Every structure is written in C-alpha cells, then in structure tokens.
C-alpha cells in the first residue's frame, strides 16, 4: 500500500466516514478509528469536539491541507462579503488541485496535488504548478498535451464513482475544463455532509 493510500484510509477511519465515496474505503468494512485504540466506544463530543471534527473532515477531504494554510483560507473567507462558510467552500473549490480533481483529470485529490506540482496542468494556456492557485470564474484549466496519455489520466476517465459537477464545463476530448461559476454548498458533490459553519465557529472561538 502506498503512503498516499494509507493516508487516505487513515483519514476515513478517523472520521468514521467514507469522505471521498470510494468503493475501497476501509469504512465500508469497519466503523472504528485507526490505531490500537480505534475500537473503543466513543463518548459524546463536546461542542468544541464537533467543531474540530468538522474542520478535520473538510481539511482531509481537500488532501489534508496544512493547518497554517487552511487557516489562511478561512481568514480570506471571513474578509469577503457574504456568509463566511459559503465563502470558505467557494475558495476551496477554486483551488487548482480541486478543479483538476473535479474535472476527473486524475482519480484523487492527492493525485491532483502531485499532478499540478509536477507541471502537467495549464491555466489559460500557461503552466501553473501551484496546487493552491485560485482559479477565477471563466478560467480554462487543461492537461498539457504531452501529459494526456499518462496512465493516471487515462484511468481517471474510466472512473464511475463520481460525476463532473455543473459548475465545471468539461471538454473531455481536449481534457480541458472551464470554471463556470463559484458553487453553492449544495452544489458541491461531497459524498458526506460537510459543515463549513462549524468550521467558522471553531475559528471564531
């Protein structure tokens, strides 16, 4: 088992949920957390515990974003007009690695981060290798022509576990995707419930 797969399995087990909706998630086989104490009965979480869990789940879903970087996203969301929780989701969905994942150019968010970092992706015709780069409405994200026959990319096109959401306009033949608009929370195809307002409460303590 690769380190990335092991990391994904650990996140699923810790959350007790199949947060990416994968058929091979260990949560499909058992409902306790990782480690030797994972089978112990869990007590009721405090308000802080519920908020912390919501934050960990959202961070984990987007590839285990580091705390410093995730807090930076929250701060930016709080500065924007409108609901901070909705803004947080909008900023996370604008990340280049998230768009690459949503467009099904690669099979996982972890693979998307590495794929971008290795220079396989262009935005509006220019190579961008920063996974946290924020895509703007109308931007076109595409796989470099030289990278389109990679096994990782070809396999991702065959995945049936998830669909491309409506706010991503996909040209499958060219492996190009236009970021049409910033989505509402209920439009984002999370396999499990995400609660960004609890994340806001966590950071607002």
From Swiss-Prot:
Record-annotated S4 RNA-binding domain positions: 94-157
GO function terms (MF aspect): rRNA binding; structural constituent of ribosome
Keyword annotations from UniProtKB, A to Z: Ribonucleoprotein, Ribosomal protein, RNA-binding, rRNA-binding
Function: One of the primary rRNA binding proteins, it binds directly to 16S rRNA where it nucleates assembly of the body of the 30S subunit.
Oligomer status and interactors: Part of the 30S ribosomal subunit. Contacts protein S5. The interaction surface between S4 and S5 is involved in control of translational fidelity.
NCBIfam families reported in the protein's UniProt record: PRK05327.1, rpsD_bact
Entry protein name: Small ribosomal subunit protein uS4
Protein species of origin: Xanthobacter autotrophicus (strain ATCC BAA-1158 / Py2)
């Amino acid at each position: 088992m690769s380190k990335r797969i092991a990391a994904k399995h650990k996140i699923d087990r810790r959350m007790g949920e199949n947060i990416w909706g994968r058929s091979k998630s260990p949560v499909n086989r058992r409902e306790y957390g990782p480690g030797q104490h994972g089978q112990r009965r869990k007590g009721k979480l405090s308000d802080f515990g519920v908020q912390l869990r919501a934050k960990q789940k959202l961070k984990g879903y987007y590839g285990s974003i580091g705390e410093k970087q995730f807090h930076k996203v929250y701060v930016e969301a709080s500065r924007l007009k409108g609901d901070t929780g909705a803004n947080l989701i909008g900023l996370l969905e604008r990340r280049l690695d998230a768009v690459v994942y949503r467009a099904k150019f690669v099979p996982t968010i972890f693979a998307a981060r590495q794929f971008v970092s290795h220079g396989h992706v262009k935005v509006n015709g220019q190579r961008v290798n920063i996974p946290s780069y924020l895509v703007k409405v109308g931007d076109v994200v595409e796989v470099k022509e030289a990278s389109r026959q990679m096994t990782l990319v070809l396999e991702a096109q065959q995945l049936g576990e998830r669909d491309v959401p409506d706010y991503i306009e996909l040209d499958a033949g060219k492996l190009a995707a236009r970021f049409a608009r910033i989505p509402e929370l209920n439009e984002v195809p999370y396999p499990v419930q995400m609660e960004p307002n609890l994340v806001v409460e966590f950071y607002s303590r």
